[in-house]
């Protein structure tokens, strides 16, 4: 990988991390009120959609491969978070909220997959 692409990857990662933290902070009152991790759920579903779109556009040559690396791996890799999903799932289970944990896991995987497919389909039509 070219040196300049590494820089774009790092900058993209910084942007994605800042965006994720902004969403988490903005939705913290709602998460506290609901007792359900809607912030990370929304982040991961949106990220899945955008990655599906990015991969489709890069795969068709609409966007150069460098955009896939900088935006897909950098921005979206830092924006989305499997580790936080896992620890939030563990927290729900730890407090005995088995039903909410199952709902969170099901929604995360199901909506994430649907969003990725929707993004890919949109990307094949643009």
Swiss-Prot record:
Q: Where does Na(+) bind?
A: 77, 80
- Mention any Pfam family matching this sequence: CRCB
Q: What is its main location?
A: membrane
What are the subcellular locations of this protein? Cell membrane
What keywords is this UniProt entry annotated with? Cell membrane, Ion channel, Ion transport, Membrane, Metal-binding, Sodium, Transmembrane, Transmembrane helix, Transport
| Activity regulation behaviour | Na(+) is not transported, but it plays an essential structural role and its presence is essential for fluoride channel function.
Which gene does this sequence derive from? Answer: fluC1
Q: How does it sit in the membrane?
A: Multi-pass membrane protein
HAMAP family given in the database record: FluC
Question: What biological process terms from GO does the record include?
Answer: cellular detoxification of fluoride
Q: Which reaction does it catalyse?
A: fluoride(in) = fluoride(out)
Gene Ontology, cellular component aspect: plasma membrane
The entry's function note states: Fluoride-specific ion channel. Important for reducing fluoride concentration in the cell, thus reducing its toxicity.
- The entry's protein name is Fluoride-specific ion channel FluC 1
What is the scientific name of the source organism? Deinococcus geothermalis (strain DSM 11300 / CIP 105573 / AG-3a)
Q: Give the family per the record.
A: Belongs to the fluoride channel Fluc/FEX (TC 1.A.43) family.
């Amino acid at each position: 990988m070219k040196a300049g692409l590494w820089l774009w990857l790092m900058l993209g990662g910084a942007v994605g991390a800042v965006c994720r933290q902004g969403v988490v902070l903005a939705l913290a009152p709602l998460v506290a009120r609901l007792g359900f991790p809607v912030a990370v759920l929304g982040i991961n579903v949106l990220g899945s959609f955008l990655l599906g779109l990015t991969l489709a556009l890069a795969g068709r040559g609409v966007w150069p491969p460098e955009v896939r690396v900088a935006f897909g791996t950098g921005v979206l890799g830092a924006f989305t978070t499997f580790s936080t999903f896992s620890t939030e799932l563990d927290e729900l289970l730890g407090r005995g909220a088995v039903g909410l944990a199952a709902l969170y896991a099901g929604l995360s995987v199901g909506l994430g997959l649907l969003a990725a497919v929707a993004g890919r389909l949109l990307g094949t039509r643009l």
